[in-house]
Regions:
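Conserved class I S-adenosyl-L-methionine
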Residues: 268-277
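S-adenosylmethionine
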Residues: 299, 304, 319-394
Length: 417
């Protein structure tokens, strides 16, 4: 039914698009550090014919005297103003100046999300990420782009590869260099590009640990960082148990691999890791696909500290919360839930289902006979997939080798209709 409704709305929108659109639109013009001189003719015409222009002080200062429209600086917080932008001047278009490509971690994407593509027109400039790749000699399609404008520094930590990192301000390079050094990646090649594309462009390079120990005092607020990360031995799809800080409460590597397969991560999805222990499932989930995030629920405060430390060590976005289901309230809605502990707590599974959207997935692992019996009951009610895993390790037995069995794991996975 929902799909039919969406098609109907789309068809209606297509029909409306054939008629002249007289309602005001938001025109977002990307501008670089070279100011008006670097703009195409269509962008210059838009700005010169504007009736009102919004932007940050730095972006508005890039406009020249040929732009005569009133200029309005973004307040802080900015979102309430964005939500009512068209209320300001309903008889004419609203113009916005933004850095580089407004659709790359920029305000253009936010405005389209708020108003839809029919009411937002974007005239992009060359992005700072593309300019940085050009200076470094890197192919853009082989380079990850990470934004730290509104994200914690550790989310730009990687175990190998390369990335262009969008900075929040002048303090970002030193903070990222310190994070890399603190997680054993001090030899990462670290390049800071300031005022890129403008007359004051400056590029400085060095190992991350040198930047962390003695960061320059004159870094420009307008900077971007190119990092070739120091690789390490843990670059596979499933990390060894020793890569995590843990107290023994960890989903072992072999079971973690089959659990990730059952969870089936997709780009941008959010996981709830319930009974997280060391956070190994949450960490592996976030590493598995671009944009994946996780919320880890764990009762023990020391384990919560370990989860946070593991997230920082692997540069992933894991929000750590307390006991489940008490701390479910206020957490972002999950796409997928994994239950690795606490299965026999009264009402836990029901609470998990209550927070999953239609099409959401749940995977639960059981070690004890009691929790296994619970999964069998749920399988009889909702079907899904019920599996049991038993693996063995080869160990010395006298002068020979014997097989030592590990504890069997029962796993139930189901998708909501």
């Amino acid at each position: 039914m929902n799909e039919v409704k969406r098609r109907t709305e789309t068809d209606a929108g297509d029909e409306r698009s054939e008629e002249p659109n007289e309602s005001p639109v938001i025109v977002v013009v990307g501008i670089g550090a070279d100011g008006m001189a670097g703009l195409g003719e269509s962008s210059r015409i838009e700005l010169r014919s504007a009736t009102v222009i919004y932007g940050s002080p730095r972006q508005l200062d890039l406009l020249d005297d040929s732009v005569t429209a009133p200029q309005r600086r973004w307040p802080s917080p900015m979102l309430p103003t964005l939500e009512h932008l068209l209320d300001d001047d309903p008889t004419g278009d609203i113009h916005v100046v933004a850095s580089g490509d407004p659709l790359l971690h920029g305000i253009g994407a936010t405005l389209i999300r708020l108003y839809g593509p029919d009411q937002v027109r974007v005239l992009p400039h060359v992005s700072s990420a593309t300019l940085a790749c050009a200076r470094m000699g890197w192919a853009v399609h082989d380079t990850e782009v990470v934004s730290l404008v509104n994200a914690p520094v550790h989310t730009a930590v990687r175990r190998g590869g390369r990335a262009v990192v969008l900075s929040r301000d002048a303090a970002t390079p030193a903070a990222l260099a310190a994070a890399l050094t603190g997680t054993g990646r001090g030899a990462s090649e670290f390049t800071v590009l300031e005022q890129i594309g403008g007359p004051a462009e400056r590029i400085r390079s060095g190992p991350a640990d040198i930047w962390a120990a003695a960061p320059p005092a004159d870094i420009d607020d307008l900077n971007i960082i190119a990092v070739r990360y120091q690789p390490d031995e843990h670059d596979g799809l499933s990390l060894p148990d020793a890569a995590f800080s843990h107290d023994g409460q960890i989903t072992k590597q072999t079971i973690r691999a089959v659990t990730l397969a059952a969870l089936s991560p997709r780009p941008g999805e959010l996981l709830w890791d319930v009974g997280s222990g060391s956070g190994s499932i949450a960490v592996e989930w976030c590493r598995s696909a671009p944009g994946c995030r996780a919320v880890a629920f764990e009762t023990d405060p020391q384990r919560r500290e370990r989860i946070a430390a593991n997230a920082i060590a692997f540069g992933v976005d894991v929000q750590v919360r307390g006991e489940a289901p008490d701390d479910f309230a206020g957490a972002p809605q999950p796409d997928v839930i994994f239950i690795g502990g606490g299965l026999t707590r009264t009402g836990l599974v029901e609470e998990c289902f209550g927070h999953l959207p239609g099409g959401g997935r749940l995977v639960a692992n059981a070690v004890t006979a009691e929790s296994e019996a619970l999964l069998v009951q749920w399988h009889s009610r909702l079907a899904g997939e019920l599996r049991r895993f038993q693996h063995y390790r080869g160990e010395p037995l006298g002068g020979f080798t014997g097989w030592r069995p590990q504890m069997p794991i029962t796993q139930w996975s189901v998708k909501l209709l």
